[in-house]
């Protein structure tokens, strides 16, 4: 088989390993593709080669290609399509290639969920599911779960003598709520659904607690923890050995060697016991006795060495003490009793989970909806059936798919879960040695365990498969990196060769795993990788842990801002592959990677202060926006006005506008009862004179509130929201505030959220509020509108997870001193795919609780998995850099941290000791000890001591390591020494002597006159309407300009709101109709009225505006000669916005400034028609003519011509500039009297 593989073509750019991955077949193949190794290109080439194979061509729809995201699937299709089109250019007559191009859109190139959906749609009749099902919204799913679970628990509470249930409640709930019990049920449900057979997994979980007739040695938890015992005892032994070496130095405390050797013997005894059984270790631990150190005269020995010896011995003793207290302070039988006692309670818990799953599935079925886990399980249900032994085997449908697919290719295989693996297994051949499964991925980049991805699947096959593929599957390593410079790759290798191993890290970073240089770059300057370790300021700016975090973010942000500015200003060069040359670095070339985003806003702020454009996709802040917060409180009050805090917030908001004094006055009217009750009581009585204004405000709001509450019971939620916006005027109000457009956009998003909610199976305001609460509980807050886009020349800030698959010339990895998130390990109960359920033993009667064996084992296992995941996250971060890698971390006490990192200094092997790697609490705890052993780390070497093996010390990589004093970063800019004296004089308000050498400087400053003063009295940006007014009056003067700077009143005062529309509002309504009326429909009263109603429904007009429209005047326009020309025109454009530059002297008739100054002019053209002989410009006017001018229209015409001449001339100029065609005619149309005025130059 191997001999038949095509040979690599002469001059091919594929490496040998890549070519092997393209052509190898005949068995299951696992490709371990390192970062930047071109795995996607290999995958596409393999598919193309299969399609165009001359001897055995495969149709593209006979391949199943599974990708991690929809975007990746689309990119794969595009690449395959482009490759096939290239083949077609060489073989234009190939019907086979043409067929493949036509089949491509139908090909199974998709995510696993899309494939599942395809299977379910095809075989829905094998399931109890409506074929018209829809995919549930995540929040809707959460609300359904809550509803089902509430019903189940309510039933359980109502059952008499439900002893075990109440035992469960007593153990796992508080006296305030049963939230913890609900969380346990939901967590067990979720975890079970990550397994092919959820019920079987749940049953095994209960079986593990059935210890009848078992000893502690029979428990999987004890077996695993014994491995941990060995690990900790080995760590203790290493400490004692190191202490012994130091004691035997010429100036070491030699008399203590005898005691240290006795310690080693003791630890040896414990280790031997750990290799035998739990009981053996327990018995040995009861007999632990440490000898007392011999007293010595410390002045006879090196004091530092003595301290180190004592410290190392104490560390060893602490390791043993920790084991004694956690694991061996109790007899083995007592651990077994815990399991016996907890077994019936756990059995009841699992029963509740099964009932919940059954009812939840039934409710989704009734509502015709499925979620993503359902897609996987339904697909698996179709593809599998149960054998006589009770095991899952391929169904007839699965066998059909096996016959259909010539090969199944899985991208990002390291992120597959157990259910997905089963689906893939059922549509591929049974035998790995003769299989047709091709898997590509990099387990070192598996960073989605929180989504239940299982890297162990990849690891298992990687260990099982061989490079030759003899007797099983084949593995191929793609280690060449075509992305990064040597300095980036060597720097990454140097760290990971020391920290990633099978025991701690889950995979050996061996020669096969190392990154190998595949890219060629020109020689560059300052390309060494860097570690910048910031020493936090001695006195924190803000007290407390949160304040310290804020300061760390600020320190790192300032350092990064300095480096970015310096690199940009100095013209630091990066390589441009498109031009094959070096070019100056741009802001877009930088990225700042963070483990999570809490620091991002502060980093953005610091960079902006330095004038650095920056972009971050902040998916937070929406619900914190003031306008959204206020509206949410309004809806909470509509739902339940008895809530004091939301009601007070609304009363205090601009909607009602009470001040603190008025709020206090209201509360004084009723010190008991809710705010709503007090408000209702206050409104029933007659107000005092001084309380009348308060009474009016509250009465207005109270009446609105009652109307809203009634409306909410009968109408849709989205209609309610828009009604509140309109009746309060709040939507218009926020539009007049700073960032008004964004605020209005935020309110529209809330309306859209309501529409989305109403598309689910839920209805009503109360449920909507719960819907939003669920979104916030999940941390799914949305980001507010963005000021910068992703394609602009900006520095980007993103999480390491978001950066996966991307690359950047210069990468900052920040926050390396932040502690790992271990909150999951602190939960009251723990779940694990292999070890099941673990929690404290709780006895509510005796009011005691203590740690159980299962909890200890699961916690230890989860910690080791977390450590391995964090290593992989760090690997992803470091491998994003193409040319320059800069690592930044902040520590509170650099000297103290250095002492801790010093443990690694003299370790003789590449891989650091397990206890150092497993004991890391942040990324710096891996990076710094590794760099401690490199020749370029002078700053670290000065603080440490000892020697490093030559192979490690002289490793071929370049590093710059620097410890930065945080005080220098937070200090203000230094004031020049020569100015100090002058500053002191100014502070003391001393006059400058007449004979002073500074006399001329002071005089020049006092007499200075701004050279562009004239320009400051005129706007740099004007609307056409404002320019028109400038020509008509003195509004262009300084005073008028200053008055214009005052914020305009966007809405009328409340006392005017019910007195009809103003002239301006009527004009706006008429213009809206003229903009949106459908010119293709008949212009009749009935049709126009119908269209106006449609505009109201679309919220283009309000009811009040619609009622004020004089439909007969609209019809009159279209009956006029000008209106008929509009209907007959070649093309009609309405409400055409424009912006153009205009000479200042054209815009301002009083301009006296420098010539050459330009003004930005903007406006909107009502209507523009194109006829055979040119363009005509039309402006609609609603001015009052009849009755205002005694001489009628003839008297008004010259006045109107003069009034609007400038405006239409500017419109014409703008159109001529943009269209490059002359405007033949400029017309004004006045609805009052149906008059047309033509404007002549």
Swiss-Prot record:
Positions with a binding annotation for ATP: 33-40
Domain UvrD-like helicase ATP-binding: 12-485
Cofactor: Mg(2+)
E.C. numbers: 3.1.-.-, 5.6.2.4
Domain of life per record: Bacteria
A GO cellular-component term linked to this record: DNA helicase complex
Record flagged with keyword DNA-binding: yes
Catalytic activity line of the entry: Couples ATP hydrolysis with the unwinding of duplex DNA by translocating in the 3'-5' direction; ATP + H2O = ADP + phosphate + H(+)
UniProt GO BP: double-strand break repair via homologous recombination
Alphabetized UniProt keyword annotations: ATP-binding, DNA damage, DNA repair, DNA-binding, Exonuclease, Helicase, Hydrolase, Isomerase, Nuclease, Nucleotide-binding
Entries under InterPro entries matching the protein: AddA, DNA_helicase_UvrD-like_C, DNA_helicase_UvrD/REP, P-loop_NTPase, PDDEXK-like_dom_sf, PDDEXK_AddAB-type, Restrct_endonuc-II-like, UvrD-like_ATP-bd
Record keyword Amino-acid biosynthesis present: no
Gene Ontology molecular functions: 3'-5' DNA helicase activity; 3'-5' exonuclease activity; ATP binding; ATP hydrolysis activity; double-stranded DNA binding
Family matches, as Gene3D superfamilies: 3.90.320.10, P-loop containing nucleotide triphosphate hydrolases
Residue ranges of domain UvrD-like helicase C-terminal in the record: 505-805
Functional note: The heterodimer acts as both an ATP-dependent DNA helicase and an ATP-dependent, dual-direction single-stranded exonuclease. Recognizes the chi site generating a DNA molecule suitable for the initiation of homologous recombination. The AddA nuclease domain is required for chi fragment generation; this subunit has the helicase and 3' -> 5' nuclease activities.
Protein family (similarity comment): Belongs to the helicase family. AddA subfamily.
Subunit structure: Heterodimer of AddA and AddB/RexB.
Record PANTHER family: ATP-DEPENDENT HELICASE_NUCLEASE SUBUNIT A (PTHR11070:SF48), UVRD / RECB / PCRA DNA HELICASE FAMILY MEMBER (PTHR11070)
Protein name: ATP-dependent helicase/nuclease subunit A
Organism for this UniProt entry: Bacillus cereus (strain Q1)
């Amino acid at each position: 088989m191997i001999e038949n593989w095509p040979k690599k073509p002469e001059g091919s750019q594929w490496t040998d390993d890549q070519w092997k991955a393209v052509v190898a077949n005949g068995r299951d193949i696992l490709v371990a593709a390192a970062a930047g190794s071109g795995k996607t290109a290999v995958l596409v080439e393999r598919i193309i080669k299969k399609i165009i194979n001359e001897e055995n061509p495969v149709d593209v729809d006979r391949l199943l290609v599974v990708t991690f995201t929809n975007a990746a699937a689309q990119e794969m299709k595009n690449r395959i399509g482009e490759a096939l089109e290239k083949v077609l250019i060489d073989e234009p007559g190939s019907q086979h290639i043409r067929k493949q191009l036509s089949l491509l859109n139908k090909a199974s190139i998709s995510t696993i969920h899309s494939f599942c959906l395809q299977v379910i749609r095809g075989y829905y009749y094998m399931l109890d599911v409506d074929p018209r099902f829809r995919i549930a919204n995540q929040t809707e799913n959460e609300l359904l779960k809550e509803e089902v679970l509430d019903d189940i628990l309510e039933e359980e509470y109502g059952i008499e003598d439900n002893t075990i249930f109440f035992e469960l409640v007593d153990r796992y709930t508080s006296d305030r709520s049963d939230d913890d019990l609900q969380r346990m049920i939901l967590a067990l449900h979720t975890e079970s659904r990550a397994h092919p057979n959820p019920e079987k997994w749940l049953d095994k979980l209960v079986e593990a607690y059935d210890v009848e007739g078992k000893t502690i040695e029979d428990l999987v938890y004890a077996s695993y923890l014994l491995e941990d015992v060995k690990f900790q005892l080995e760590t203790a032994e290493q400490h004692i050995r190191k202490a012994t070496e130091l004691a035997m130095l010429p100036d070491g405390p030699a008399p203590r060697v005898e005691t240290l050797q006795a310690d080693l013997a003791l630890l040896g005894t414990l280790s031997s016991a750990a290799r035998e059984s739990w009981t053996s270790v327990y018995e040995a631990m009861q007999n632990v006795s440490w000898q007392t150190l011999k007293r010595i005269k410390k002045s006879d020995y090196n004091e530092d060495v003595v301290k180190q010896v004592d410290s190392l011995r104490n560390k060893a003793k602490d390791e043993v003490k920790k084991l004694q207290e956690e694991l061996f302070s109790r007899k083995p039988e007592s651990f077994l009793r815990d399991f016996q006692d907890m077994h019936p309670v756990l059995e009841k818990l699992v029963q509740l989970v099964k009932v919940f799953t059954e009812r939840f599935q039934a409710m989704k079925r009734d509502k015709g909806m499925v979620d993503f886990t359902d897609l996987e399980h339904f697909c698996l249900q179709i593809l599998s059936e149960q054998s006589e032994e009770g095991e899952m085997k391929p169904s007839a449908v699965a066998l059909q798919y096996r016959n259909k697919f010539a090969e199944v290719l899985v991208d990002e295989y390291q992120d597959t879960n157990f259910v997905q693996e089963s689906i893939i297994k059922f549509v591929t051949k049974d035998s790995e040695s003769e299989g047709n499964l091709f898997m590509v991925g990099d387990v070192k980049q598996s960073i989605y365990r929180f989504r239940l991805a299982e890297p162990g699947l990849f690891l298992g096959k990687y260990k099982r498969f061989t490079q030759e593929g003899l007797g099983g599957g084949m593995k191929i390593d793609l280690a060449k990196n075509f992305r990064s410079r040597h300095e980036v790759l060597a720097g990454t290798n140097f760290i990971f060769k020391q920290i990633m191993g099978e025991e701690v890290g889950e995979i050996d970073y061996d020669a096969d795993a190392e990154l190998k240089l595949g890219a060629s770059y020109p020689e560059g300057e300052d390309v060494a990788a860097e570690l910048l370790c910031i020493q936090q300021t001695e006195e924190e700016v803000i007290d407390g842990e949160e304040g310290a975090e804020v300061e760390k973010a600020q320190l790192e942000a300032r350092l990064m801002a300095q480096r970015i500015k310096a690199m940009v200003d100095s013209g630091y060069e990066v390589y441009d592959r498109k031009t094959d040359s070096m070019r100056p670095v741009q802001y877009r070339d930088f990225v700042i990677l963070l483990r999570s985003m809490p620091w991002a806003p502060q980093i953005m702020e610091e960079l902006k202060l330095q004038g650095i454009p920056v972009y971050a996709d902040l998916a937070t802040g929406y619900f914190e926006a003031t306008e959204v917060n206020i509206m949410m409180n309004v809806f909470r009050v509509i739902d339940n006005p008895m809530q004091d805090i939301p009601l007070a917030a609304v009363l205090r908001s601009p909607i009602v506008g009470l001040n603190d004094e008025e709020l206090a006055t209201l509360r004084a009217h009723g010190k008991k009862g809710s705010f709503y009750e007090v408000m209702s009581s206050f409104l029933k009585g007659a107000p005092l004179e001084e309380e009348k204004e308060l009474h009016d405000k509250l009465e207005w709001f109270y009446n609105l509130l009652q109307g809203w509450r009634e409306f909410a019971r009968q109408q849709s939620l989205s209609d309610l929201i828009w009604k509140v916006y309109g009746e309060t005027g709040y939507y218009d109000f926020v539009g007049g505030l700073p960032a008004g457009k964004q605020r209005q956009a935020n309110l529209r998003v809330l309306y859209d959220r309501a529409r989305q909610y109403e598309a689910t199976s839920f209805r009503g305001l109360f449920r909507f509020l719960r819907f939003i609460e669920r979104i916030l509980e999940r941390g799914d807050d949305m980001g507010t509108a963005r000021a910068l886009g992703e394609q602009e020349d900006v520095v980007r800030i993103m999480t390491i997870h978001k950066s996966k698959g991307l690359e950047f010339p210069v990468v900052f990895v920040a926050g390396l001193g932040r502690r790992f998130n271990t909150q999951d390990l602190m939960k009251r109960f723990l779940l694990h795919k292999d070890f099941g359920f673990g929690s404290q033993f709780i006895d509510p009667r005796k009011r005691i609780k203590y740690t159980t064996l299962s909890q200890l084992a699961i916690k230890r296992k989860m910690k080791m998995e977390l450590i391995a995941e964090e290593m992989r996250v760090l690997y992803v971060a470091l491998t994003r850099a193409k040319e320059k890698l800069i690592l930044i971390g902040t520590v509170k006490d650099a000297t103290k941290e250095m002492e801790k990192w010093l443990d690694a200094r003299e370790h003789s092997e590449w891989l650091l000791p397990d206890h150092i790697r497993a004991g890391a609490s942040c990324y710096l705890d891996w990076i710094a000890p590794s760099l401690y052993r490199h020749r370029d780390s002078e700053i670290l070497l000065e603080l440490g001591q000892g020697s490093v093996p030559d192979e490690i010390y002289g490793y071929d990589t370049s590093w710059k390591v620097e410890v930065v004093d945080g005080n220098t970063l937070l200090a203000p800019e230094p004031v020049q020494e020569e100015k100090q004296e002058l500053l002191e004089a100014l502070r003391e308000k001393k006059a400058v002597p007449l004979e002073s050498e500074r006399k001329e400087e002071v005089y020049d400053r006092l007499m200075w006159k701004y050279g562009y003063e004239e320009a400051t009295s005129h706007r740099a940006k004007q609307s056409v309407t404002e320019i028109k007014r400038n020509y008509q009056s003195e509004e262009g003067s300084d005073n008028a300009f200053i008055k214009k700077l005052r914020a305009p009143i966007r809405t009328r005062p409340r006392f005017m709101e019910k007195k009809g529309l103003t002239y301006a509002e009527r004009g706006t309504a008429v213009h809206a109709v003229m903009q949106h009326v459908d010119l293709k429909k008949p212009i009749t009263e009935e049709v126009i009225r119908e269209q106006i109603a449609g505009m109201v429904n679309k919220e283009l007009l309000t009811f009040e505006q619609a009622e004020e429209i004089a439909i007969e005047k609209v019809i009159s326009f279209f009956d006029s000669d000008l209106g008929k020309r509009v209907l007959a025109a070649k093309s009609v454009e309405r409400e055409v916005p424009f912006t153009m530059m205009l000479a200042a002297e054209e815009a301002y008739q009083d301009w006296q400034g420098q010539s050459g100054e330009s003004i930005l002019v903007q406006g909107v053209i009502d209507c523009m028609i194109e006829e055979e002989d040119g363009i005509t410009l039309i402006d609609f006017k609603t001015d009052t003519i009849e009755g205002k001018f005694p001489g009628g229209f003839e008297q008004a015409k010259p006045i109107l011509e003069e009034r609007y001449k400038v405006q239409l001339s500017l419109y014409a100029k703008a159109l001529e500039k943009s269209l490059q065609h002359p405007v033949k005619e400029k017309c004004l149309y006045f609805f009052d009297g149906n008059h047309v005025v033509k404007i002549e130059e």
